[in-house]
Amino acid sequence: MARVCQVTGKAPMVGNNVSHANNKTKRRFLPNLQNRRFFVESENRWVSLRVSNAGLRLIDKKGIDSVLADLRARGEV
């Protein structure tokens, strides 16, 4: 399963660890993904999504029905 948020599309990015001596080594910055279930009242069922914390905030702001409509338009869910 890819480490990608289903709502925002956030994915791992690449950067550097930087030591005190300014040595740089490659590392990955992973999105803060959570597996969450949301109850959709209009459909009277639960929907499971793998969302980042930013995606959870977006769902709180716009509502699960609006977010699901966007996902279905993109063909995600």
Curated annotation (Swiss-Prot):
User: What Gene3D superfamilies does the entry give?
Assistant: Ribosomal protein L28/L24 (2.30.170.40)
Task: Output one GO BP term.
Answer: translation
**Record's keyword terms, sorted:** Ribonucleoprotein, Ribosomal protein
Q: Which residues cross the membrane?
A: none
Whether Ribosomal protein counts among this entry's keywords is yes
One Gene Ontology cellular component: cytosolic large ribosomal subunit
The molecular function terms in GO held by this entry are: structural constituent of ribosome
Q: Does the keyword Transmembrane feature in the UniProt annotation?
A: no
User: What HAMAP family does the record tag this protein with?
Assistant: Ribosomal_bL28
Provide the family line: Belongs to the bacterial ribosomal protein bL28 family.
* Protein name (Swiss-Prot/TrEMBL): Large ribosomal subunit protein bL28
* Provenance organism: Cupriavidus necator (strain ATCC 17699 / DSM 428 / KCTC 22496 / NCIMB 10442 / H16 / Stanier 337)
**Gene it is expressed from:** rpmB
